[in-house]
Amino acid sequence: MTLDALNRTYDAMQREYGDPNLRSIFYGGCTESPDICFVFMNPTGRNIASDPAWTGIRAPWVGTKNIWDLFSAIGRFDERLYQEIKGRKPSDWSPAFAKEVYTEVARNRLFLTNLGKCTQADAAPVSNQVYSAYLSLLEQEIAIIDPKVIVLFGNQVSSVFLGRSISVSRCRKTRFDRTILGKTYPCF
């Protein structure tokens, strides 16, 4: 399977699990052995790349501000570009600017993705059953990009991905191993 083939599957799943007026959001960043693969929950309509009229990349967090604080804080993002993001409204993001942002993500050897690619209109909870439907596809995505480390965000994503109940507040900085297609990945 290729990333492009996964994208076609994600689009089909959007029709089943996501808002029918929005498009699925794929992933973005370094696709060849990134240092860190960040796995978030699922996109919302706040991501302007979910708009059917958007012609740019369909990557996580396009048109948003807060998540970029994290990448700046860990020294994995250009300060000038970070300040430019902070000063822009969502409507100020162009396809060219989104590409510039994700070129910087890739330069810093990061890969950003969501467990569920089904874009919802808002941040309403998504069931474990829906996330589980995406799990084998995320595993294929991870096997293709082959990250050095996986960082999971939130109790639900961590629990579904690791196959056990996880309370992030109780296991901060704890390493979990996850084997995908015969290779073991450290997860935090």
Give names to the regions the model predicted.
Residues C171-T179:
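Short glycine-rich, acidic/polar surface loops and turns
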Residues T2-V149, F153-C171, K183-P186:
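A polyanion-binding, active-site-adjacent surface
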